[in-house]
UniProtKB/Swiss-Prot annotation:
Highest taxon of source: Eukaryota
Family: Belongs to the protein kinase superfamily. NEK Ser/Thr protein kinase family. NIMA subfamily.
Substrates-to-products reaction catalysed: L-seryl-[protein] + ATP = O-phospho-L-seryl-[protein] + ADP + H(+); L-threonyl-[protein] + ATP = O-phospho-L-threonyl-[protein] + ADP + H(+)
Role, per record: Required for renal tubular integrity. May regulate local cytoskeletal structure in kidney tubule epithelial cells. May regulate ciliary biogenesis through targeting of proteins to the cilia. Plays a role in organogenesis and is involved in the regulation of the Hippo signaling pathway.
UniProt protein name: Serine/threonine-protein kinase Nek8
Gene knockout outcome: Morpholino knockdown of the protein in the embryo causes ventral body curvature, pronephric cyst formation and laterality defects, including reversed heart looping.
Major localization class: cytoplasm
Entry-linked SUPFAM superfamilies: Protein kinase-like (PK-like), RCC1/BLIP-II
This protein's encoding gene: nek8
Length: 697
């Protein structure tokens, strides 16, 4: 006992005394179970040893942590975690007749669910799950199960035949002497959930025979109708007399009412409040530092072309790079990378965002006014702009797959197919059922029942596609851009009607329009078709369509009608403000829409509603449109731009130029472009080194 100082006796268990002790090394409070081995029967000693054996196998935040065991004065001492909030049974008793909210019930229940799932995954049966063995932390928010004294480790048998446990929680099969397996723990879990909802036990009687009769007949008082039908049905399912009809733990975890509280655990439990609140870099995108469950920013670095020359001499250039230009930056500017690989980028009106290979969100923002280097009075040379890169830190377990930016709002898609949005809530583009701004990524709850595979943001609306090829849209509805047959706006996702044989693969949002690409390379479009930027005019050759064949606006998704968009296999497409670009399977590049600034890539500025094949470009793999310029990527990493050149749009010091010309990136090795995004007058482009496959020797 050199390590511990006994404080008081807090209970007497089945086999011994329970002490509250203070650990001398760090003054932490721990529980010490004192089990007098010599006075115990063989079965009792085996039970005590079993508890140690089981606790060593378990490691979970919702299970009482095991520290060590040792012998002291012929007694077995087990040191374990102290839960100061008391038992769940005490908590329920103190409620008197004041029923708990359903959210509170589910918050506690899913923690027990996760703990039991961990136990069963270790091939262990708890066999004595009850509210007296479920403990709470000091805030009574975190639930931990304990008391594994009569647990059973399943080595080779799949069932345990001994009848143990508290009578009120014993399952019907145990009353009949049938084997005990995981489904008996499910019954006990159902009893605990019933107790949380009713503040009383499901099965109680004056004597054991009467109790067994109630259990065998499945007779218990109905649950209050203040709770949802889903919760009441879940309890009924878990308390089914037939063990085979009780749900498995993973089925319960997948239940509709459990998904949200389970997700909340991973975003809320264990968060640390920050006392010092940093000034955000922008009004919308900065995370709510110090707010529970929020995303915080960290790891600042600065980068810019002004220091590029000196850094070359000291350190080799990074293998993975992200470049930006536009808004006054006339040549590609390498952004600080935080020593990571960015695999996808997106641009909004004010946001520059990326996703790293490890599934983290990274953002680049200009420093706030006054935070840069001071300039000398009378200086005329303009400093190259600098950017600060930050990781947007979520809670553990969240891996971001892709990001898409709108005007002042952002959507991100996780590897589990869940969409989260944050930023400005105007026009309902966050999809949360309201128009409120959200400064931390928040799950779009209406889509939790679907697995999303891709999402796209326009200026003020969003489209998303599921793994079942369904499409949802929400946000601003002007011009029919949502494809819902009206111009109404929606602040909650709405399912889009698609042709019966159309299998959606990719969605794309423009400023005031939308497109959907199918697995068969068909294209649907809706919204504003000004200048035929969606290809909805009936065009069969090189002649301009008659006014009868011209389409200005559609409110439902329709197949594109302009050749060759409706005849060639289109593999990549992007929409700008007034024009669009498409890439065929053969690597050809077609532009269509306005040509006011030469953004269609032809030598003249004449307006035409006929798609134009950009000459001189071959092997194009991807392309993008800004407000009045176009960008294309070649198979070997070549970057071409054309159109309006003001304020650095083209990545070179030229004004409007209607013929594609290359953009020079500061790369000393061969590279490929992994992702590109254009928005308004800006471009964001990610590259990685290109390594040739070694040939046969």
């Amino acid at each position: 006992m050199e390590k511990y100082e006994k404080t008081k006796v807090v209970g007497r268990g089945a086999f011994g005394i329970v002490h509250l002790c203070r650990r001398r090394t760090d003054s932490a409070l721990v529980i010490l179970k004192e089990i007098p081995v010599e006075q115990m029967t063989r079965d009792e000693r085996l039970a005590a040893q079993n508890e140690c054996q089981v606790l060593k196998l378990l490691s979970h935040p919702n299970i009482i942590e095991y520290y060590e065991n040792f012998l002291e004065d012929k007694a077995l001492m087990i040191a374990m975690e102290y839960a100061p909030g008391g038992t769940l049974a005490d908590y329920i008793q103190k409620r008197c007749n004041s029923l708990l909210d359903e959210d509170t019930i589910l918050h506690s229940f899913v923690q027990i669910l996760l703990a039991l799932y961990h136990v069963h995954n270790k091939l262990i049966l708890h066999r004595d799950l009850k509210t007296q063995n479920i403990l709470l932390d000091k805030h009574q928010m975190i639930v931990k199960i304990g008391d594994f004294g009569i647990s059973k480790i399943l080595v080779s048998k799949s069932k345990a035949y001994t009848v143990v446990g508290t009578p009120c929680y014993i399952s019907p099969e145990l009353c009949e002497g049938k084997p005990y397996n995981q489904k008996s723990d499910i019954w006990a879990l159902g009893c605990v959930l019933y107790e949380l909802a009713s503040l009383k036990r499901a099965f109680e009687a004056a004597n054991l025979p009467a109790l067994v009769l109630k259990i065998m007949s499945g007779t218990f008082a109905p649950i209050s109708d203040r709770y949802s039908p889903e919760l009441r049905q879940l309890i009924l399912n878990m308390l089914n007399l037939d063990p085979s009809k009780r749900p498995q733990l993973n089925e319960i975890m997948a239940h509709a009412i459990c998904i949200r509280p389970l997700l909340n655990l991973y975003t809320d439990i264990g968060n640390v409040k920050m006392r010092r609140i940093e000034k955000p870099l922008s009004n919308v995108q900065a995370g709510p530092h110090g707010r529970p469950g929020g995303w915080i920013t960290s790891t600042r670095t600065r980068g810019g072309l002004s220091s590029l020359t000196s850094s070359k001499m000291m350190h080799p250039l990074p293998l993975f790079s992200v470049y930006t230009w536009g808004s006054g930056i006339s040549t590609p500017l390498r952004l600080p990378m935080l020593n990571t690989e960015v695999i996808q980028v997106s641009l909004g009106r004010t946001q520059k965002m990326g996703v790293t290979k490890s599934g983290r969100l990274i953002t680049w923002e200009a420093p706030s006014v006054g935070s840069g280097e001071p300039t000398l009075p009378g200086a005329v040379e303009q400093m190259q702009p600098q950017f600060i890169s930050r990781f947007l830190e979520g809670q553990s377990g969240v891996t971001i797959k892709s990001v898409s930016c709108g005007d002042l709002f952002t959507t991100c898609l996780t590897d589990r197919g869940i969409i989260m949005t944050f930023g400005s809530g105007s026009n309902g583009c966050l999809g949360h059922g309201n128009f409120n701004d959200v400064t931390q990524p928040k799950i779009v709850e209406a889509l939790l029942g679907y697995e999303l595979v891709q999402v796209s943001c326009g200026a003020s609306h969003v489209l998303a596609v599921t793994n079942e090829r369904e499409v949802f849209s929400w946000g601003r509805g002007d011009n029919g851009r949502l494809g819902l047959a009206t111009q109404d706006s929606h602040n909650c996702p709405q399912q889009v009607s698609l042709p019966a044989d159309f299998e959606a693969q990719r969605v794309l949002c423009g400023v005031d329009c939308s497109m959907i690409m199918s697995t068969q390379h068909q294209i649907l479009a809706c919204g504003n078709n000004r200048f035929n930027k969606l290809g909805l005019d009936k065009v069969s050759g090189t002649e301009e369509p008659s006014s009868f064949c011209q389409v200005e606006e559609v409110h439902l998704f329709q197949l594109v009608q302009s050749a060759p968009l409706n005849t060639e296999k289109i593999v990549y497409i992007d929409i700008g403000t007034a024009h669009s670009v498409a890439v065929t399977e053969k690597g050809q590049c077609f532009t269509f829409g306005s040509n006011q600034h030469g953004q269609l890539g032809c030598s003249h500025r004449r307006s035409s509603r006929v798609p134009y094949q950009v000459s001189g470009l071959q092997g194009i793999t991807m392309a993008a449109c800004g407000d009045a310029f176009t960008l294309a990527i070649g198979a070997e990493g070549e970057v071409y731009t054309w159109g309006k050149g003001a304020r650095g749009r083209l990545g070179r010091k030229e004004e409007d130029f209607g013929i594609p010309k290359p953009v020079q990136l500061d790369e000393s090795h061969a590279f490929t472009v992994t992702s590109v995004a254009c928005c308004h007058g800006n471009t964001l482009l990610a590259v990685k080194p290109f390594f040739e496959e070694p040939g046969p020797k």
